[in-house]
Amino acid sequence: MKTIEVVAAIIHQGGRILATQRGYGEWKGMWEFPGGKMEAGETEEEAIVREIREELNVGIRVERKVCTVEYDYPQFHLRMHCFWCSIAEGVLELKEHQSARWL
């Protein structure tokens, strides 16, 4: 089974955590932590910084790795590396998501 490696940012600010709502694809409308697929040659930390810049147009501070979650979908195996992060620079701008909420 094919393994897909992704990264996810658990972005915190003022005691709340950011959730984003997908704006495209099979899971459109579903809520998630922002992130995405790793590219060849990237470290996990490089991937999460790049993905958040692409999706939300902000720079983040990666504070620590929280966990790696593995799950078997019918078509592939998912390996998701989750990081505790904060916004280091910029103002959130949704580039790929249809909505975002601080929870």
Where are these regions (language model features)?
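Conserved N-terminal beta-strand and adjoining loop/helix that marks the start
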Residues: 1-17, 37
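The catalytic Nudix box helix
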Residues: 33-65
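Active-site-adjacent beta-strand/loop module that shapes the phosphate/pyrophosphate-binding cleft
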Residues: 59, 69-92, 101
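Nudix hydrolase/Nudix homology domain
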Residues: 26, 31, 93-103
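A short, internal acetyl-CoA/4′-phosphopantetheine-binding micro-motif in the GNAT/acyltransferase core
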Residues: 37-40, 88, 103
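Conserved hydrophobic "DFG−1" position in protein kinase catalytic cores
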Residues: 11-12, 19, 85-87, 102
